Amino acid sequence: MVLYEYPFNESIRTMLRLEHLFKRLTLLVPRDEPVDHHFALVTVFEIMDVASRADLKSDILKELDRHRSVLLGYRGNPHISEAALDEVIGQIDEAYQALNNQAGKAGQALTANEWLMSIRSRISIPGGTCEFDLPAYYAWQQHPAEARRQDLARWIDSLWPMKNGLDL
């Protein structure tokens, strides 16, 4: 039997959408084919769209703080490993700090990249990323897979604090 759970809270639904998109992104980036890197960029743009919600960052920070408070309540419990508890609380603290220190929304730094934004504006148009519409993008797709992966890693670097916060 398949069980479908419907989260009623819009904030939780948004976080689940982002979790899904980050999972897709981490599957696509390591691949070698240009089409996989095309869809990795599509996913980056989708993450930027979903993450553009004004209160998302504060919602994730509140969730991290809530989890930290719950875990602190387990201190002194003889059935809980203090070392494991300290490790998880440390991970939460690191994720909280990284996300809190990030200026603006996730992916906001990418909006300054005119080349990426030209792709973003054409990517939703059916067939809008043809080689004659975006010759520079077509040329990028012809680069070696490792070079494309390095570019993707550089572009998605600003998204990782949010991903790490969601993972916890």
Regions found by a protein language model. Name each.
Residues 1-168:
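Surface-exposed peri-terminal alpha-helical interaction modules
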